[in-house]
């Protein structure tokens, strides 16, 4: 069984954010970035399932600027087998990200797709639901880990 896990690069949760002077967003220059914490949880659960012998491969995917590859590297460091980085410049809306993920899912053909419950940078909780609709697949929304695997 192959598990694909989407991971997002966000401003680290310990950073006190500052709004740009023109009010168009938050300052990200020289700000510590990290993997979205709920996505860390998704990677961790996927790796645990693989370690229990219930999955054969965990693939981490991120969509974002060049530096977003750091999130894939972190996923590899904790046990993902492969990583995919779709490089895009600028900020994408959740539907655009969902459409990119749809193409990856169509190509990779995973048995499961894990995503964190929401991103801490926007709290929208839209990408997973949109991806589910685009793929015409069922969605298990905000599940709790079950033990044992």
Question: What is the predicted role of each segment?
Answer:
Residues 13-15, 39-43, 68-70, 121-127:
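Short glycine/serine/threonine-rich phosphate/pyrophosphate-binding segments
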Residues 1-63:
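N-terminal beta-strand-loop-alpha-helix module at the start
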Residues 140-149:
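Single conserved hydrophobic/aromatic residue that forms the stacking wall/gate
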Residues 123-135, 139:
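Short Gly/Thr/Asp-enriched flexible loops that form oxyanion-binding sites at enzyme active sites
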Residues 105-110:
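Glycine-rich phosphate-binding loop signature in dinucleotide/nucleotide-binding domains
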Residues 16-22, 70-77:
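Short, flexible, mixed-charge acidic loops at enzyme active sites
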Residues 71-96:
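A glycine-rich helix N-cap at a beta->alpha junction
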């Amino acid at each position: 069984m192959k598990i694909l896990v989407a991971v997002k690069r966000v401003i680290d949760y310990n950073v006190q954010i500052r709004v740009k002077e023109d009010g168009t967003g938050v300052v990200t220059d020289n700000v510590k970035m990290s993997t979205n914490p709920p996505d860390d949880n998704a990677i961790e659960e996927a790796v645990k399932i693989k370690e229990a012998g219930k999955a054969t491969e965990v693939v981490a995917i991120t969509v974002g600027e060049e530096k977003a590859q750091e999130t894939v590297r972190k996923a590899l460091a904790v046990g993902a087998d492969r990583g995919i980085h779709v490089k895009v410049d600028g900020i994408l809306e959740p539907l655009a990200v969902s459409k990119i993920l749809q193409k990856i899912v169509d190509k990779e053909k995973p048995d499961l797709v894990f995503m964190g419950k929401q991103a801490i940078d926007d709290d929208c909780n839209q990408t997973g639901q949109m991806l589910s609709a685009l793929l015409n697949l069922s969605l298990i929304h905000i599940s709790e880990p079950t033990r044992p695997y």
